[in-house]
From Swiss-Prot:
Record lineage: Bacteria, Pseudomonadati, Chlorobiota, Chlorobiia, Chlorobiales
Keyword Metal-binding tagged: yes
Assembly and binders: Monomer.
Function recorded in the entry: An essential GTPase which binds GTP, GDP and possibly (p)ppGpp with moderate affinity, with high nucleotide exchange rates and a fairly low GTP hydrolysis rate. Plays a role in control of the cell cycle, stress response, ribosome biogenesis and in those bacteria that undergo differentiation, in morphogenesis control.
Residues given in the record as GTP binding sites: 166-173, 191-195, 213-216, 280-283, 304-306
Stretches for region Disordered: 120-145
Pfam assignment, any one: MMR_HSR1
Domain OBG-type G as annotated: residue spans: 160-323
Predominant location: cytoplasm
Name under which the protein is recorded: GTPase Obg
EC number: 3.6.5.-
Single GO BP term: ribosome biogenesis
């Protein structure tokens, strides 16, 4: 299934039904008076977070959503039925913005969470509402109100506990494939990963956490270079960042600092998240290799996805950072 993390849709709530102009017409009641019913309310448009969805792909094919209008009022004071509401399901982690103003409308995170996106128009009042002491037979009823209509942008931000961050070919996809059941495409060339991958990492017999592998960052990503900010937003919701640098690179410390710089330019709040430095590809480094000094107060774990060395230490460190109060 193709991964799509942005879409634009137009929603239209139902118009209200018109009020009715009607008068009693019964035998032996020559002046029956007004009896027009009220119109029904138009249908609302709701958004609902659904944990069974993982992409916004469906919205690339269906872009317009419209609820039903309310039914018009009838004689004998019969009110029109309310128009049927519609519920649009979106993946958990979907941010909704007004396409015109850019204003954030809602952020749907929890499964089943709902938001009223467009309100249906009120039903018009029938002619009995307009009687006065001097006007006993009004020939006027109120039209139904217009339902709200707006254009919105949907942005999906993945819901994961751990975000893997690194330059292309840092070993992110290989690492997530050995720690979880995820099977991303792996090859020895840059930008093998073109979309984010999610994997569930088991911890012990009954515990687990979710890890996200996003496409490799390059210098200038915050300004849109490479795959740019298209995927950087997917690490905004993570609880901890695993910053990967390749042990066989020429300047691991320089790579690390560049990665931090790109994240800070995109969103300074990313650097406030707990992070763990993961030095990968330890199976191919020279025997004389010694781990460089990165940051004194940030955990540093050397690993090899090939020999599996360091993986349990990394798994434990990630779990303890995500859940400091759960053994």
């Amino acid at each position: 299934m193709k991964f799509v993390d942005s879409a634009r849709i137009v929603v239209k709530a139902g118009d209200g039904g018109n009020g009715c102009v009607s008068f009693r017409r019964e035998k032996y009641v020559p002046k029956g008076g007004p009896d027009g019913g009220d119109g029904g309310r138009g249908g609302h448009v709701y958004l609902r977070a659904n944990s069974q969805l993982a992409t916004l792909l469906d919205f690339r094919y269906k872009k317009n959503y419209e609820a039903l209008r309310g039914v018009h009022g009838q004689g004998s004071k019969k009110a029109g039925k309310t128009g049927k509401d519609i519920v649009i399901n979106v993946p958990c982690g979907t941010l909704v913005k007004n396409s015109v103003s850019g204003e954030v409308i809602c952020d749907l995170v929890e499964d089943g969470e709902e938001f009223l996106l467009a309100r249906g128009g009120d039903g018009g009042r029938g002619n009995p509402h307009f009687t006065t002491s001097t006007r006993q037979a009004p020939r006027y009823a109120e039209p139904g109100g217009k339902g709200e209509e707006l254009k919105v942008d949907l942005e999906l931000k993945l819901m994961a506990d751990v975000g893997l961050v690194g330059f292309p070919n840092a070993g992110k996809s290989t690492l997530i494939s050995v720690l979880s059941a995820a099977r991303p495409k792996i090859a020895d060339y840059p930008f093998t990963t073109l979309v984010p991958n999610l994997g569930i990492v088991q911890y012990g017999e009954y515990k687990s956490f979710v890890m996200a592998d996003i496409p490799g960052i390059i210098e200038g990503a915050a300004e849109g270079k490479g795959l740019g900010i298209q995927f950087l937003r997917h690490i905004e919701r993570t609880k901890v960042l695993a910053v990967l640098v390749s042990g066989d690179g020429e300047d691991p410390v320089g790579e690390y600092r560049l990665l931090l710089g790109e994240m800070e330019r995109f969103d300074p709040a990313l650097l406030q998240k707990p992070r763990i430095i993961v030095v990968t590809k330890m199976d191919v480094v020279d025997e004389a290799f010694s781990l460089p000094d990165f940051e004194d107060d940030v955990p540093l774990i050397p690993v090899s996805s090939i020999t599996r060395s360091g993986l349990e230490e990394l798994r434990n460190a990630l779990w303890n950072t995500i859940n400091p109060s759960i053994p």
